[in-house]
Amino acid sequence: MKEFRVRFAPSPTGPIHIGNMRTALFNYLFSRSEGATFVLRIEDTDLERSSKGFEELIFKELKWLGIEWDEGPDKPGPYGPYRQSERLEIYHRFAQKLIEEKKAYRCYCTPEELEEDRKKAIERGEIPRYSGRCRYLTKEQEETFIREGRKPVIRFMVPDDEVIEFEDMIKGKITIKSDTLGGDMVIIKSDGMPTYNFAVVIDDALMKITHVIRGEDHIYNTPKQILIYKALGFEIPKFAHVPLILGPDRTKLSKRHGHTYIGQYRELGYLPEAMFNFLSLLSWYPEDNVELMSKEEIIRKFNFKRIHKSNPVFDIEKLNWMNQQYIQKSPVERIVDLAIPHLKKAGYIDEIDELRYNWLKDVISLYKDGLSYVAQIVDMAKTFFVEEVDYTGEMIEFLKSPNSIKVLEAFKGYLKDKSEITEDDVREWMKKAQKELGVKGKEFFMPIRIAVTGEEHGPELVKVLALLGKNRVVKRLDRVLNLIE
């Protein structure tokens, strides 16, 4: 049985987009569910925009999500090198082969000439395509152009009136006519760098890739690549073009929809297992329709035949719900460790000793189950880290009521002789005080909560008071009583 091989081939020109990460994930899931080899290839031929920093970021984000590769720049295999910038001689060798077989040629057209041809085609009501003017240059014509200082590109001869068909694993049979492909295509640019469509064919063929799984925005590239496969006598892989992810307004996911890079979600405190789970369900669903699944369960259930043709919508509310489920199941220590950088960035904490860490654990435990992502702790638990809390005009008016003043003064009096606040003690006092003051329920608890936290809602009040400590609670009571006098 033939060994299946798939690849993820990002360009290190920026952070990984959500759509690209979903493509990487589907390649990974296919490889692990089918026992295939997963190759990571870096397409860094855009020398100006590519950087080692972005390459390292690609490695980091993939590893964070839990995607491991079998071969790649850092995991040498039999078909390397795995960076396109290290494979230039290979591309030139195959380009020369095509020239010798009269399937490609050097083109000396200037940008001005090409632009003029494009304008004329539009004026005639035609789709712009390369005219083919350099297809059959004589040796003398080439020498003249060289003397003029023209640097040639190498163009692949696209056959006229050929019908290119392929069976897409998701979309079914796709048919495209060769005369819609824009004419003879550039395969080597004037600076010697290969174009995407040429390099990707050479790499996929030599790396023995059997299944090319990528976004549907590459469908138009596929017939061009099939022509190159055929011209070089390479075996054509199977293609699967996964539907593009849409925003809530059903347009292509972009920055205007919010965060679009995987790293932005990592930095906000989304858990990798939640993101792995969420992304896997964009276009795919298991037979049992279960939504919350571990990585191992997803791999076990994954079947490429269950990928839908329709475009999935990136539903941030669904992601938040799913991440919340994973946060709830996580040990509090894990959430504390993820929260500390956010609290430091907000200026709420500095160095942390064991005592402070344990206090943080207790504070974060109050909010943990309500977090959609870890960075929310900065706003949710703000009252524990600021000296003074703010009050709205409505809050001040509420606190000015006779019952509110009565409750606050009684609470302050109770604290006067206490060295510290304990949950059991304050709970007992509250029971007695409600009877003695004749103020019960919301009328009793709300003044204390607002005065001490600046919030109308929150975790169990006695726990909040105990964690804030007597000194801060008394300071806030004094301040609010001064404000409302």
UniProtKB/Swiss-Prot annotation:
Annotated InterPro entries: aa-tRNA-synth_I_cd-bd (IPR045462), aa-tRNA-synth_I_codon-bd_sub2 (IPR020751), aa-tRNA-synth_I_CS (IPR001412), aa_tRNA-synth_I_cd-bd_sf (IPR008925), Glu-tRNA-ligase_bac/mito (IPR004527), Glu-tRNA-synth_I_codon-bd_sub1 (IPR020752), Glu/Gln-tRNA-synth (IPR000924), Glu/Gln-tRNA-synth_Ib_cat-dom (IPR020058)
EC number assigned by the record: 6.1.1.17
Residue positions of motif 'KMSKS' region: 252-256
Main location group: cytoplasm
GO BP term (any one): glutamyl-tRNA aminoacylation
Entry GO terms, CC: cytosol
Protein name: Glutamate--tRNA ligase 2
Provenance organism: Caldanaerobacter subterraneus subsp. tengcongensis (strain DSM 15242 / JCM 11007 / NBRC 100824 / MB4) (Thermoanaerobacter tengcongensis)
Gene designation per UniProt: gltX2
